[in-house]
Swiss-Prot record:
IV repeats lie at residues 179-224. This is Integrin beta-like protein 1. The gene is itgbl1. GO terms for cellular component: cell surface; extracellular region; focal adhesion; integrin complex. It is found in: Secreted. The lineage of its organism: Eukaryota, Metazoa, Chordata, Craniata, Vertebrata.
Length: 488
């Protein structure tokens, strides 16, 4: 063996022997490694995370041993030592952060060359005449800067002498001082946020200033606010004590014409180019109905942007669509140049040259067709042998005595079928001569249901004892709002 190699071998052998002689320490384990727990007292940790206004991590994160761990939101992110910075913090003008003429740097707009102002909305040089400048500063009522600011080179500078920033908007139309609660002196009573003078309350609070606490269960609140597509307020509003408060303004400053019991209608879909200060719906050739354009005769397209060639006059077109019905397309479709497009588009349940057949009329409230005892033909049930009734819901054979049957047909007031029908095998058969009578005991009057275009529930739902139960794709008190896909 080489001398150098022999020396290394002897050294290694000695080291192994030395380590073997050391007794194992029973106390050595990962648990005995130095602790990573915070050594700061809780008070000191919180102090390091507290902002000058007293909030922990600006209310946008959690404090971990004196260090702020900022939350990450889908619409942007919080950052900074105290989570004080956010993509939304900077001022906006005309729907754009820093007016599109600068960069947002932790709540302050850094303006490009040639622009100034808290939102970089003012050009440093102006080549407009005073008349032209004032015209550009007028709101929809022709008032310059809503009498809440001054006009500078065609742009409004809102009066905020205390630098509160509570008056803002392209035309200084927003005044958040209206959100102050006179009693608590807090914005929205401390239970909501203010956008353009309107309070948007936190869950469990409601009122103009979020001053009232809700007294119904969370389950009932959610149920009332769930939109037809299963979302809370259609993701376009806030659920407040079972009622949807639709967002008129989103966090970027953009306005939305949003309405409906569950904020299901968004009128922005009716504008070819969205401008929150414009009323140019449906290209000027139609009416916006819950975010869908109903075009005037002679126009077509999702936003009525295309002229339609038709050789028929308006009256000739309607007459051709009406046929023998009382209304064009039987009130169940759209008439275009003498041809009916039935509601809902692509649904085979409504059909016919004039949309005269509506097989939805064969469904009961549980969705069964003709009570599963018959077939539907053009909206009328053809019952199997042994069954009868409008929806084939009555069996001809009966194993009850007459007394047993009558006892089940009496309402709480002791009257048989409310005096508006006959009793068969324990069930009321409402008088066919009085078409509007319905209900388990013939106690309901379908004439109480809301109408639209002269039709109960607009023909798009079932009247259930005074309330319209709308079919899929329809909404509104009279089922007059179509929420489904656009016409082909």
């Amino acid at each position: 063996m080489h001398a150098g190699a022999f020396i290394n071998f002897v050294w290694a052998l000695s080291l192994v022997s030395l380590l073997a002689a050391v007794p194992p320490s029973p106390s050595f384990s990962l648990k005995n490694l130095p602790s990573t727990a915070c050594r700061l007292p809780p008070a000191v940790s919180e102090k390091r995370c507290r902002t000058p206004d007293g909030s922990i991590c600006s209310g946008r994160g959690s404090c971990d041993c004196g260090i702020c761990l900022c939350e990450v939101k889908e619409a942007g992110k919080y950052y900074g030592p105290l989570c004080e910075c956010h993509d939304w913090v900077c001022h906006t003008y005309d729907g754009q952060v820093c007016a599109g003429h600068g960069q947002c740097d932790c709540g302050v707009c850094k303006c490009d060359v040639g622009w100034s102002g808290e939102a970089c909305q003012y050009p440093t040089t102006c080549d407009l005449t005073r008349k032209k400048s004032n015209e550009m500063c007028k709101n929809s009522q022709a008032v310059i800067c809503s009498n809440a600011g001054t006009c500078q080179c065609g742009r409004c500078k809102c009066e905020n002498s205390d630098n509160s920033g509570l008056i803002y908007g392209k035309y200084c139309e927003c005044d958040d001082t209206e959100c102050f609660d006179d009693e608590t002196q807090e914005i929205c009573g401390g239970h909501g946020k203010c956008y353009c003078g309107n309070c948007y309350c936190e869950a469990g609070w409601h009122g103009d200033k979020c001053e009232f606490q809700c007294d119904i269960t969370p389950w009932e609140i959610k149920k009332r606010c769930t939109s037809p597509d299963g979302k809370i307020c259609s993701n376009r509003g806030t659920c407040v004590c079972g009622e949807c408060t639709c967002h008129d303004v989103d966090p970027t400053g953009d306005w939305g014409d949003i309405h409906g019991d569950t904020c299901e209608c968004d009128e922005r879909n009716c504008k070819s180019v969205y401008d929150r200060y414009s009323d140019d719906f449906c290209s000027g050739h139609g009416q916006c109905n819950c975010g869908r354009c109903d075009c005037k005769d002679g126009w077509t397209g999702r936003k009525c942007e295309h002229p339609r060639a038709c050789a028929l006059s308006i009256e000739e077109s309607k007459k051709k669509c009406q046929g023998s019905a009382s209304q064009p397309c039987s009130g169940r479709g759209k008439c275009e140049c003498g041809q009916c497009t039935c509601f809902p588009p692509g649904d085979s349940k409504v059909y016919g040259k004039n949309c005269e057949c509506d097989d939805r009329q064969c469904e009961d409230l549980e969705g069964k067709i003709c009570g599963e005892h018959g077939t539907c033909s053009c909206g009328r049930c053809i019952c199997e042998a042994g069954w009868f009734g409008k929806l084939c819901q009555h069996e001809r054979k009966c194993n009850m005595t007459e007394e047993e049957s009558k006892s089940q047909c009496e309402s709480d007031d002791g009257i048989l079928c409310s005096g508006k029908g006959s009793c068969h095998c324990g069930k009321c058969i409402c008088s066919p001569q009085e078409w509007y009578v319905s209900g388990e005991f013939c106690e309901c009057d379908d004439r109480d249901c809301d109408k639209h275009d002269g039709l109960i529930c607009t023909g798009n739902g079932i009247c259930n004892c005074g309330n319209c139960e709308c079919w899929e794709g329809w909404n509104g008190n009279a089922c007059e709002i179509w929420l489904g896909s656009e016409y082909p």
